[in-house]
Amino acid sequence: MKYTSAQANKLLKKLNDEYSALLHKEQRSRDFRAAMGEDIESVRPAYDYAKTQARLEELEGTIRRLKHAINCFNTTQVVDGFGITIDEMLVYIPQLTKRKSKLLEMKSRLPKERVEEQYGQQSNIIDYTYTNYDLAAVEEDYEKTADELSRAQLALDTVNQRDSFEFCE
């Protein structure tokens, strides 16, 4: 069956949720307590070891194959307008996000700011911190980075919704 990356990731989430729920259910039912004199069979939870292990192994195999298919797709599919693979884009977007955050902090500074504390304590000495960069250049770089980040995210969203790959469950 053909899946887009977005569909495959939704399926992966569903499989992981089912796997976690089954593990949790197994943990709650694989052993149990009974009071002295209580009929053990009346409080025994339903649990089939062989059936549970078989389903867990089946889910593990499907999850493994699906992750591999997604990884293969991500390392070979090129993102339009960028000339890099999805895999590279998944590294590039956090880099842009980090750069944007740094530039936001830099562009928010005043050229000269009074320092209120020194070494975590109030000081009677008047001290100033000065920016050592061109604020206009930082603001320009911030706008370019924010635009590039938006463009990258939209391009990645497009390829994840449009292009598909084959995966057999």
List the model feature ranges, each with a label.
Residues 1-169:
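Structural preference for solvent-exposed beta-strand-turn elements
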